[in-house]
């Protein structure tokens, strides 16, 4: 079985013995040919009689016999004569090295390393062999094993200088069970402190009393069962005695003690890691100095190097191992460690790939391509300071004087500016110097370690600890054939760090990354950089699989648009230079992902315009600290950052020059997610976003129309209570002059799909303007509701309502173009369609009986136009007519519970809970809200009002509070999906105060127990009265009335106004209704407040039945206990014992040694 794991060497690469043979073979003359023959050999079965000194060493080779028993065929079939005999000699030398040279600690560590290389079947077989071998000594070690695994205190074992204490600790560790954590913890506390050991070594070394402890008698005879004879150990680690005050045996016992403890499975992982660190400190303290190596006799040089490698851990990187191996004479039993084989790989060639300036400072970064002797190629990036310090500290024997002077002069030139340098090109000089570097420089250990290590600057910059050293194995015969491909891969693997500056006036380079099929070399780092989530979000918005545009095209377009903006706005030349510097860093990569630009949006009749999407949360290459540094502040894209702060803060209304410039469209919302949208309108280009917040804009004559404000998309880590900003939507216009209508955001993810074949597919709510007038734009809700965590919530909703302004220009057509498509509705009734659907048509004022009343909005002075809701708006008392539905647009707003098929291009619509928050028209239509009505509940009646808009259209900052006439004190202050502020008009067009449609004073809902008995609406949502990490879940069934005794002795309110009720934030992220904490108190029922309807379903818990008798909640029979299965109670109230405590797993796989045989007849019978 081991044959399948064997590499081209004689045994496994992790085994030190064969690897150590190679340096010795290289040192001997004429050993190259046997080395080649050993590459393909397989170890034959061990010889019957091997010359071993002490009796215990044969047991480990016997354990190794079964795996290597099938090797003769491989050994016999080796190329060259004498292959089988050479393999036998190799194996015999391995046995001699293991039994005679290694000490106990080194043998145990070596055997554990071999066991890690075995497969499970081999381990089972070796376990059987070990059981058989250990059974013979079981009756001798039985008492000690009981003491080691028992609960009794082993006694005082604190003084590690006593040989009896060390011997007893070694025996206890050897006999400790692998699952006895309690005894392992006790032994861990009894282990000597490594600091005390090191202090003792220093003290005895200072006194000069060496070998004082060596001749002390062993306190326990059982020590010999765990250790070999003192002769091999003393001779094997003779070097340790030269460096410390403890004797040979004491040093070996301490090493054995810490080695066994660091490898024992009974200790926890943390304990083993700590013990491994202590072992390394002890080994470094006991290791011999280089000057002592020259004084030692030459016949001990081989064993000294072997013990140095064996005492050193395989993970450790010993710098002196290679130097010691070079001094080994050919006559010693030299076996190199595995570490020496790794260090034997040297550098063959160093090429300077490129020099780039780091940020705007004066230092540079150097990217090197390093070819190693094992045919691997690495790309290393070093800073100017690191390279200069490395060359200054380089020993003189590894480099020539002319080389140092020339390269240091070039590096000193690199710290200067380009105009101050003597040599104009630094890169060719350094490239020539490194390519012609001497062999002594390339093969030195410090050069290898420098080009293997990770740059400290890279460790500082990348939070994911991604190494700037990436190795790609390239076969030698593929180097010449695929030189171009390999150079491209190396370019891909280069690191260039783009540092983003989050200051307001500083230029930034925030490049949005469009999803593209990346190659395997780049996608292996995707999970560490958060690109997986970005791909899932970005690729969901792509309707057609098209190739991504390069980032150079995007920024060249940005430069052209910026240059035109500079001509118009008179920007200084410094801003243009900043743009050029931005362009120089386009083809760079961040953390292994190449930056590319989003899609272009091509129009069929107008010029092409770039769809520039600003960087959002998942900008490629961002680290987690950058993403969460300022979550509630809007991101600035590259172009906005180049503008001055005064230009960004100015008030941009519909008459501003930005509305006239459709080619400078940019989607720079409130931390919006960078997505790529493929938009192909048939007749007119839809450009997405401008600098001042215009999101949707018709490309032909969009500047003639005012805008509809709506809530932009928020960053997904927006703090609770963050203020809402405004981004404006212009009302698009069809080819024949008819206004398409308004786009009303809902609280769910809204996707824009095409209703008819002539309509254009829109990626982000882009209305396609076609040549026909009978077109509908249908907005369906995605079945996935948008969590309320991603939406802004005001800290005091009753006082900080945001009233949006709706500015619509009347269409140029007559009122005949809007035929009445819906019959008039009777008073208090509901119209056609689902009760979850609201149609918001846009139509001409000629369809309304009421005459317009002038308002105070000074922006536009055109004819009035009304946006009304004729669905879900009960017309109450004296409404003379209903609002007709026009034929040119239909906006469907289903609630979150409406299941709609998700179109291929879905976009989480940036909406707050205000579904129809764009309320008053710009000139004559306003919110007909009485003092007790809900202004943000978004009701628009066919009549007119003189209430001005409370918020200006293009306020750049947070919206102020509305007028006092529009505030109210109910819990439904933030209601979004349904309309309750409906006014009535008489024939003269004056306002009649509407009947109160507020909630029931007892239950907070519109039920028959309050004053509004004629309105029975069972399936609707409540507002969100508070900020918090709540998730909105759809309501799956209607809400029963819970007015009887549901509140804490709350009196009935006849006026319909309910007291404001604010609950603390729920600690449950899933938003499920949990069992109330106060459920055991009297007169307490599940409180159903109106504000929680948007957070989670507000039906009462099935186990809580409200009553008026004051006896508390009652459990009904619908509840069952999962512990005992009986209905009527929960598992926490169950009287039966927990089933988890009774059902214990009976499957245990362990190695339990059998009882000691009464006599020796069993062995003979077997």
UniProtKB/Swiss-Prot annotation:
InterPro entries: PX_dom_sf, ZCCHC2, Znf_CCHC, Znf_CCHC_sf
Start-end of Polar residues biased regions: 919-947, 964-982
Biological source species: Mus musculus (Mouse)
Ranges of Pro residues composition bias in the record: 43-64, 949-963
Biased composition range(s): Basic and acidic residues: 572-587, 634-653
Low complexity bias locations: 65-76, 624-633
Pfam families: Vts1, zf-CCHC
Gene expressing this chain: Zcchc2
Gene Ontology MF annotations: nucleic acid binding; phosphatidylinositol binding; zinc ion binding
Region called Disordered, residue ranges: 1-85, 205-240, 550-668, 904-982
Zinc finger annotations (CCHC-type) as residue ranges: 1119-1136
Protein name: Zinc finger CCHC domain-containing protein 2
Compositionally biased residues, Acidic residues: 214-223
Keywords: Metal-binding, Zinc, Zinc-finger
PANTHER family linked: ZINC FINGER CCHC DOMAIN-CONTAINING PROTEIN 2 (PTHR46939:SF1)
GO CC terms of this entry: cytoplasm
